[in-house]
Amino acid sequence: AIFKSYCEIIVTHFPFDEQNCSMKLGTWTYDGSVVAINPESDQPDLSNFMESGEWVIKESRGWKHWVFYACCPTTPYLDITYHF
């Protein structure tokens, strides 16, 4: 799959600005009793990342979350959120 992420850009300190972006991957169709999301590490696989001459990824991390929504307070849903 190919995912595109858009981030809010704040250029107050241009050209020395830093941006923080997040990408959340999960399912609302199947709950945590049916779907297992187990990342191999907290570092995303950037092997297919296309570099840009305009910016660099300085740091990236991922976290697994168990989420309980108001509709179903006893049913866990899983997601992985990556921060760049």
Swiss-Prot record:
The gene is CHRNA1. Keywords: Cell membrane, Disulfide bond, Glycoprotein, Ion channel, Ion transport, Ligand-gated ion channel, Membrane, Postsynaptic cell membrane, Receptor, Synapse, Transmembrane, Transport. Disulfide bonds join C7-C21, C71-C72. Upon acetylcholine binding, the AChR responds by an extensive change in conformation that affects all subunits and leads to opening of an ion-conducting channel across the plasma membrane. One of the alpha chains that assemble within the acetylcholine receptor, a pentamer of two alpha chains, a beta, a delta, and a gamma (in immature muscle) or epsilon (in mature muscle) chains. The muscle heteropentamer composed of alpha-1, beta-1, delta, epsilon subunits interacts with the alpha-conotoxin ImII. Signal peptide: none annotated. The keyword Transmembrane applies. Belongs to the ligand-gated ion channel (TC 1.A.9) family. Acetylcholine receptor (TC 1.A.9.1) subfamily. Alpha-1/CHRNA1 sub-subfamily. It comes from Felis catus. GO terms for molecular function: extracellular ligand-gated monoatomic ion channel activity; transmembrane signaling receptor activity. This is Acetylcholine receptor subunit alpha. It is found in: Postsynaptic cell membrane; Cell membrane.
